[in-house]
Amino acid sequence: QFAKQICNDYNPIHDPDSKRFCVPGDLLFALSLNNYGLSEKMNFDFSGLVPADKLLVFPTAENSELVIKDEREKAYLTLVREGDNNPDPKAIEYLVRSYVAFSGHSFPYILVPLMEQHQVMINNNRPLVMYQSMSLNLDQLELNKPEVKLINADMQVEGKRGNVTLHFAINDGDKAVGRGEKKLVLSGLREFDAQAMEQLIKEYEARKV
């Protein structure tokens, strides 16, 4: 429900009824901030898809580098933090809600124009867009109404793989308070087909009903 209700993300692999279900990367991001607070610099590297039945272990906040693993020591997320820290739950909630709302609009509003530009598209029968990494740089840690806005997006195509980087700004009111970037991997790329893409978007939008 996090993906749908908070992120407005209707990716089929985030549907609990899907056989391919995995925990949304944005949920791992939110849980990490909830556990460790906001730091001036934060880098998140995702190293695996988390199945529904996995119990994750969040280590105590003793080090600048924290690795979130399951009970069998398989790593799923590495968080590296620098600078001052703010554990205020309100500031964390404000930033999480703004960021995941931005993130949830990646498809179709950002990714489809990129794919069309490069004349490639994800497999419409098994669409797969994966979180690779994300970084945040905050100029201040006291946040009231942060808003995450896209600056620009680019895509590098390597065979059937597409590497996408979303650059974004973080504003609080009329003040710039930070910036960051999100990296995604698009798998199983094929030649762009406008009709197939239109159908994929329709199916995605239908999940919102």
Give the positions of each predicted feature.
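Long, helix-rich, hydrophobic modules that act as membrane-proximal anchors or helical bundle/coiled-coil regulators
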Residues: 150-152
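Hydrophobic, proline/glycine-rich low-complexity stretches
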Residues: 1-54, 99-124
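HotDog/MaoC-like acyl-thioester-processing domains
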Residues: 1-2, 50-52, 60-147, 156-209
